[in-house]
């Protein structure tokens, strides 16, 4: 296994006469370092350039001489968190390749590192047989900041800096030999914000969260798509980019070239003499902090099946304290044997609540009504475990609802000010209750969409594929992290695309696995009907959505398929050893006109836990009951964009 050579660069303290100071870049670097240390298992050569040390020459030298030490089989990572900028291209060679007529650059503390020069430096490292990756969390374009609570990572163009930088720039080879994960498209700004009081780049926060939850063998394409979904919670104006994105290329290789990758074994429950019972799974594996999460003892796969282990199958332990690498637990109504070690699987997930802020400067009565409705949104008219009021957006967690009451309406907004839903009326007490019901509904939907299993023995065993109907070649996410499916043109107008949705069991031997396919729509619905509410798929076999009939992707019936119109779906595959009760995964679309109390999801999630239990009744597939319920599980998510072409 090779070594990871990492150069992490973060700049908060820019010259005041050149750039606006930032606050989250050093936090990005610190969090990236923590993840790398955990992921590489000691095979890490780390260099950091922070604030005043991050000059143009030191960054370029760091890539050449620090990352340049890497040898074939090693991995080189360049991470930059700071300002970006752009300027009209003036060099003839640049004009030949800059279709927009503009050059982009990283803003170092004393000048600019033009992206073309950066590309050459990284490709020179990759030319030696080194797996090379760059993560850039900065702007490559301007534009007005759209969210009062976000800071733009963009520096105004400086002609003197660009003139000096352009002279040093060379034209990189095509195609690039390194993989790039960038915070934005070329025409978009990049932002930073605060999460639980700590500043981070929106992209860095989303990417690091996706990596913590990802399997050790997750590819750049998979990680990029997961980060894109996470970032969408905070901003619709910033779209991360993956390059090059061609199928079968470097984008489909494991992150960091697979360094540190291994097939995860089942998590184990054992006793520590000092701290008591613990499971070797913690926040570093993607487990959310806080109590409530549960594990259940599963049947051992090894020949060493002691009577104590077998008798304990199906027993539960509940998390008390979640640490980075382990979780202290309390047995639920049973007493494990002190000398025994039990394999366990995650059976109930305490998903963090959404944060809510209220703003109604001209309507104190609306503030009181909304505050009351949110405080009584839980079971029996009490607090909901899904919602948490915070005083400032800066104190919020990843999912933030900014409620602004104005003009007799409640606006439910993201961090960047974009709306989650259309404005809701706010004329009376029942309207405030409807706003609270909306927040609970949106929270449940986001918890389902963003559900990721910690590394599991089932990871990679089954693959979800989407292909054009009649084709054997699966589609892959593009540079925006989405599979794009476009309407065709028929005699009567636009024709919706037809696709085949397939679930392949990649193993040739072993056990069959239970597969549930969720369709999460951008109307905030979740249903499991594409794959019959769940089925077993045997080794070497393939399951087909709708019994191998075409799946039509289309706009909702009430929307006209005009050029440029689009909808998004997130297809989430949940793979388990045994059958899974899918009731907690059903969610009707959000309908502001539906009577309050008609949405059946409220009681299913009264305790704020997402449970992985066996169904009350067995499926139509006859088979012996699986002891211990669904057992080990894994997830895969594919984001699909169905659009009407503009021309």
Regions found by a protein language model. Give the residues of each.
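Beta-strand/loop-dominated core regions that host nucleotide or nucleotide-derived cofactor-binding catalytic loops
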Residues: 263-280, 285-353, 526, 531
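Short beta-strand elements in bilobed, periplasmic/extracellular small-molecule ligand-binding domains
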Residues: 41-50
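Active-site-proximal C-terminal subdomain of hydrolase catalytic domains
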Residues: 10, 29, 115-237, 520, ...
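Secretory-pathway glycoprotein ectodomains that are cysteine- and/or Ser/Thr/Pro-rich
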Residues: 144, 351-647
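Beta-strand signatures of extracellular beta-sandwich domains
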Residues: 77, 296, 514-518
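Caspase-like cysteine protease fold
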Residues: 6, 171-172, 187, 214-276, ...
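Caspase-like (clan CD) cysteine peptidase catalytic core
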Residues: 3, 53-81, 85-150
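Short glycine-rich His-centered loop
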Residues: 2-21
């Amino acid at each position: 296994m090779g070594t990871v050579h990492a150069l992490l660069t973060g700049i908060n303290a820019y010259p005041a006469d050149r750039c606006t100071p930032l606050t989250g870049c050093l936090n990005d670097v610190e969090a990236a370092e923590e993840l790398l240390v955990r992921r590489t298992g000691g095979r890490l050569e780390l260099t950091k350039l922070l604030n005043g040390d991050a000059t143009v020459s030191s960054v370029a030298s760091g890539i050449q001489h620090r990352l340049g030490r890497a040898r074939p089989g090693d991995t080189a990572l360049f991470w930059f968190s700071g300002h970006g900028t752009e300027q009209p291209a003036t060099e003839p060679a640049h004009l030949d390749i800059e279709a927009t007529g503009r050059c982009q650059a990283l803003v170092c503390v004393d000048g600019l590192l033009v992206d073309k020069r950066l590309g050459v430096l990284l490709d020179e490292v990759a030319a030696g047989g080194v797996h090379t990756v760059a993560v850039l969390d900065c702007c490559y374009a301007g534009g007005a900041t759209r969210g009062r609570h976000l800071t733009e990572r963009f520096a105004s163009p400086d002609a003197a800096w660009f003139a000096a930088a352009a002279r040093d720039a060379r034209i990189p080879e095509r195609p690039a030999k390194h993989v790039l994960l960038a915070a934005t498209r070329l025409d978009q700004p990049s932002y930073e914000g605060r999460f639980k009081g700590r500043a981070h780049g929106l992209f860095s926060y989303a990417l690091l969260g996706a990596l913590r939850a990802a399997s050790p063998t997750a590819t750049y394409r998979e990680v990029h798509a997961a980060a894109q979904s996470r970032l969408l919670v905070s901003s619709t104006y910033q779209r991360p980019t993956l390059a090059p994105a061609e199928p079968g290329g470097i984008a489909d290789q494991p992150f960091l070239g697979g360094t540190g990758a291994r097939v995860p074994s089942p998590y184990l429950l054992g006793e520590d003499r000092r701290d008591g019972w613990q499971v070797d799974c913690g926040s570093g594996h993607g487990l959310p902090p806080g109590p409530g999460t549960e594990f259940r003892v599963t049947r051992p796969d090894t020949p060493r099946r002691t009577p104590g282990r077998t008798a304990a199958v199906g027993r539960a332990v509940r998390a008390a304290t979640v640490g980075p690498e382990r979780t202290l637990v309390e047995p639920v109504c049973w007493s494990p044997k002190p000398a025994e070690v039990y394999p366990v699987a995650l059976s109930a997930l305490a998903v963090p609540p959404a944060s809510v802020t209220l703003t109604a400067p001209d309507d104190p009565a609306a503030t009181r009504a909304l505050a009351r409705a949110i405080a009584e949104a839980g079971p029996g008219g009490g607090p909901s475990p899904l919602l948490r009021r915070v005083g400032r957006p800066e104190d919020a967690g990843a999912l933030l609802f900014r409620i602004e009451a104005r003009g007799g309406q409640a606006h439910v907004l993201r961090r960047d000010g974009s709306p989650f839903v259309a404005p809701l009326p706010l004329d009376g007490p029942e309207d405030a209750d409807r706003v609270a019901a909306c927040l609970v509904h949106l929270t449940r939907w986001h918890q389902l969409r963003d559900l990721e299993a910690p590394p599991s023995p089932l990871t990679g065993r089954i693959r979800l594929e989407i292909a054009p109907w009649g084709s054997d070649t699966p589609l892959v996410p593009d540079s925006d992290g989405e599979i794009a499916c476009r309407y065709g043109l028929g005699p009567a107008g636009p024709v919706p695309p037809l696709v085949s949705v397939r679930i392949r069991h990649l193993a040739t031997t072993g056990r069959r696995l239970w597969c549930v396919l969720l369709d999460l729509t951008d109307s905030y619905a979740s249903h499991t009907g594409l794959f019959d509410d769940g089925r077993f798929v045997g080794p070497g076999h393939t399951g087909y959505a709708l019994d191998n009939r075409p799946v039509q992707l289309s706009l909702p019936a009430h929307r006209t398929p005009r050029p440029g119109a689009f909808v998004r779906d997130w297809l989430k595959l949940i793979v388990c050893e045994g059958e899974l009760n899918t009731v907690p995964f059903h969610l009707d679309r959000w309908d502001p006109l539906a009577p309050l109390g008609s949405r059946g999801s409220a009681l299913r999630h009264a305790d704020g836990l997402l449970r992985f239990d066996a169904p009350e009744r067995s499926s139509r597939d006859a088979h012996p009951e699986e002891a211990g319920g669904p057992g080990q599980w894994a997830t895969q998510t594919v984001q699909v964009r169905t659009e009407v072409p503009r021309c």
